[in-house]
Amino acid sequence: MFLWGQSDTLWTADIIGEVSTGSEYRTSADSLATDVESASDYLQKDSRFNLKQYTPGSVVASSFGGASSEQSRVLWDGIDISSMATGVLDLSLVPAMMLSTTSIVDGINGGASSNMGSMGALNLNLSPKSGRGTTTAIGLTSIGERTLNAHSWGSFSNIRYQSIVRFTSSENEYDYRIGTLEGRMVGNGYGDLTYLQRFSGSMGKTYWSSDLWYTQSEKNNSGSILSPGYINHLEDEVVRFKYKLKRGHNELKLFASQEWQAYTDTMSSWTLRDTNTFGQFTAHYTRTEKLYHAHLSLNRYTAGGMNRTATVWMPQVQLNLKPSQAWNTVLKAAQYHNHVYWSAYALYSHSKTPWLQQWSVGSYYRLPTLNEMYWNPGGNVGVSAERSYGAKYSLEHEGKWTIRFTSDQLYYDQMIQWAPGSDGNWTPQNYYSVYTSTTYLGVQRKIWQQKHAFNTTHQYSRILDVASNNSNIIGKQLIYRPALQAVYTIEQELPVGTLMLRGYYTGLRHTLRDNARTGDLPAQSWVDLAYSLSSKSKRWQWVFRIENITGAQRQFYQYYPMPGRTYLLNIKLHS
């Protein structure tokens, strides 16, 4: 069915409630994977997700289209929690159980859902639970990963609660082969701990909820297979708190977070330790009426540590108008670093069973981060915000065949890029003008006793202008953007259990800005096989999965090989 705003809470941008986002198909193996995997691992089954990862469990740079990772935003119950220090959020530290089947808002529609995004958004939320229960999930892999996830829920004194503890640890050692290079990857171990706690209830006609999200992680990186193998160490600790009150037409959300990060660099004769902090406070008020939704928010971002010290305030006003059943518009204004930024978005829908068509246009901004403005040395307080202008078309069909087609066309101006400055230091500059085109096709169909799900994304980019003497990159494509990604899933019900076969394809990617062939990552494809079995009462479930059954060569960064054939066992107990 068409899913228009399937969420248990009000989003920051209610226009998303009118956007058709499509629905992810989850196999039996996928359902258990959400209790064990991180969001970055789980989202690889969606071709709209662009992943850059050194090794399993490493820091992830990701996006949902667009021209850079900073342009795609991550929301938590409508609050933009993407770091305003770095501009991104490491999805390897996000539990997959915070993803719903409609979490991804693709294209320029995602820009309407966040404070400063322009292409794609991911909305995280903890699904509500009824009754009382406890689940324990355990995951084991052949490369040394061990995962434990404990989830309990219930109520006391008319207060609902959910508690989640997730622990992951891995030696992350495996053999590799890239071309004629062979060896064993070592020194990339990692571990993380996540604690989520929710309380919710009602006081008269007022609904309230409070959420605490704590994460602590440590990751090692031994560098590429061409490096000497010095091990760098990253420590990260973050606590997030969100409180919500909702009564009638009014809603208030308060969000606060504090992150501490330490990076130890040993890839030279010197051992360097860099420690930094980042904080965010957001107060968000929403007034909901039949023809409009009004939003007022106040954001405070702070950064401290060895490389930058800064505090920036960002008040924002947003008005969502619904003049008719077919039309929706969003108007936004924000003040950031003594500048006022405007953006606008419009959506038109036409529905005639079994078809749904939507057209949308929008103009957005991507604000410079605190690192880009204040990093020492190299920060540029004068760097301008990126601007984007885009259009989107969506077509959906619901019947025996479920089909979703989307096409996004965007022009980006003043894209920010770190480049050598006049003093020799690397500094952020408004470097590019870029055109991007992203086309997505998703198809689902049940044939006999098999369920088939196919999704593919085609991306095209072209650098139109560059603010430097480096004119040889004009006309070139952006780096690390595969022209084509595709995922095909078949699920077969067996007399006992369920079998899943899933194939992946990632096209050629450029890693050099001049698109020289010496830096190209060739197209890669691999296949996963999974068998799942559960009791009739669903009291237990287990999945045995073989990833990359053919041992295909894979790498998301050049000379950082991913594992070959890997075995995984996931077990879930429910009481």
Please provide the spans of the model-predicted regions.
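Extracytoplasmic beta-strand/coil segments of soluble accessory domains associated
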Residues: 41-80
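Short strand-turn segments of transmembrane beta-barrel domains in outer membranes
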Residues: 101-106, 111, 121, 127-154, ...
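Gram-negative outer-membrane beta-barrel transporters
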Residues: 321-328, 409-411, 430-512
